[in-house]
Amino acid sequence: MRECLEADEMIELNRFLFEQTFHKLRASNSLDKVLVVSQDDQALDFARLNGGIALQENAESSLNAAVAQALQFIMTTGPGRVLILPADLPYMTAEDLEALLTRETAERAMVIVPDTRQLGTNAILLSNANMLKPQFGRRSFQKHIRQATSSGAELIVWLNENIQQDLDTPQDFSFYNKIILQPTHIMKE
């Protein structure tokens, strides 16, 4: 993405995507709470001001460490389902989110939504916070599948084109820019 955008544009895009995703999560009737873990004070303030829970990410943390920190925090607040979702899912709708939240069935279940290339992981729904050791990054989809099957959890791989489309590559951004940021207006003659 750094090939497509200047640093300040990246910050602006990330903030827009975060706020868009946050509002979709808060609007869901199927979620009790929205937890944001971040090192960004503005993101944490936004979460607090909009009814979310803000958790200061440990210094110099990786994505996996931040997710593990969030899962640990959730385990201290009591049992329950957990949805792990990045902010770079601009095509996800409220309907997609609700459909995902109805997928879990077993007492120990893991629902995984891969990216379009089925290499990365774009969403994970867990029946318990203690079921996952986060392994985001290269080939995370396969790693999370292995983790689910080796733990004896019911594994559900759910393919949803809107949740699968993220903004990880310059090609992803180019498509997003054409479709969302610069829509074409078609007029009937």
Descriptions of predicted regions:
Residues N14-S30:
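A short, N-terminal amphipathic alpha-helix
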Residues R48-R81:
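Short phosphate-binding loop-to-helix
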Residues R139, R146-E189:
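Conserved alpha/beta core of the MobA/IspD/sugar-nucleotide pyrophosphorylase nucleotidyltransferase superfamily
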